């Protein structure tokens, strides 16, 4: 009885995590960070910020809500792969339309770069989900973490554990397998890093990357001492998680 109650609490916590880190929710902190952190002329940024939010979150979420009320989808997070096609068509159309609006507005380079990741990443994940249930949650939280690393430098490292937390929640709720979570991380991670590399944000000339590079170099001696033990511990932890899941 106690074990059952504990399991219910764990499932409830996993569900809360899934809702908090839903893609439509994470859009707001992503664009808030890139649009307003360290900026001077905030009023000039607001139109582009609102445009990005409207086309990546507001319209797609309202469309899914209407589909849910019309009973075209059984859950707001659309866990059933067969129900995803029409909502994804709407969302991808919104993303493409928003891109052309943003091009006309000529936003800052970082905002356009992040929007490009949505423009390339969402269709890629949408195509994959037609035959394999890749994790959208894992994709979105990975993008969130990478953006925060680009914007906030070393402080962005604090967001990396969120990827593990969200991945755990999706597996715990049995919405995805470990492979599907890792797939979401890999796809959006690759696209994000490629876009940021092409647009010049992955060089040490950029403040955040320079800061991260310095942090890694300054801690290298310490890591040389602790990494073998840490690596062995990590292997045992991953083995334990694998055995628990499978």
Tell where the protein language model's regions lie, with residue ranges.
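Short, Lys/Arg-rich, polar N-terminal cytosolic tail immediately upstream
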Residues: 1-14
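Transmembrane helix-loop-helix
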Residues: 81-86, 98-114, 224
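Membrane-interface capping segments at transmembrane-helix boundaries
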Residues: 4, 69-73, 240-246
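Membrane-embedded catalytic cores of phosphoryl/pyrophosphoryl-handling enzymes
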Residues: 108-245
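Hydrophobic core of alpha-helical transmembrane segments in multi-pass integral membrane proteins
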Residues: 29-33, 54-66, 88-102, 161-164, ...
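Juxtamembrane helix-capping/reentrant segments at transmembrane boundaries
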Residues: 74-91
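Short, hydrophobic transmembrane alpha-helix segments
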Residues: 34-47
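The first (N-terminal) embedded transmembrane alpha-helix
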Residues: 17-37
């Amino acid at each position: 009885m106690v074990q059952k109650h504990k399991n219910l609490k764990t499932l409830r916590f996993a569900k809360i995590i899934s809702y908090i880190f839903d893609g439509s929710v994470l859009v707001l902190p992503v664009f808030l960070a890139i649009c307003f952190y360290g900026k001077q002329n905030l009023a000039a940024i607001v139109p582009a910020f609102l445009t990005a939010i409207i086309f990546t979150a507001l319209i797609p979420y309202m469309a899914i809500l209407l589909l849910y009320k019309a009973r075209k989808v059984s859950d707001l997070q659309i866990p059933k792969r067969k129900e995803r096609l029409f909502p994804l068509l709407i969302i991808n159309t919104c993303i493409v339309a928003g891109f052309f609006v943003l091009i006309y507005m000529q936003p800052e380079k970082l905002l356009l770069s992040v929007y490009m990741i949505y423009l390339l990443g969402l269709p890629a994940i949408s195509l994959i989900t037609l035959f394999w249930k890749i994790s959208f949650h894992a994709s979105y939280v990975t993008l969130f973490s990478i953006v925060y690393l680009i914007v906030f430098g070393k402080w962005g490292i604090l967001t990396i554990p969120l990827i593990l937390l969200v991945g755990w929640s999706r597996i715990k709720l049995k919405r995805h397998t470990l492979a599907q979570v890792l797939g979401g991380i890999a796809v959006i991670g690759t696209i994000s890093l490629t876009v940021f590399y092409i647009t010049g944000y992955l060089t040490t000339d950029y403040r955040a990357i320079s800061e991260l590079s310095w942090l890694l170099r300054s801690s290298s001696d310490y890591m040389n001492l602790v990494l073998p033990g840490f690596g062995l511990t990590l292997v045992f932890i991953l083995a334990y998680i694998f055995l628990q899941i499978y």
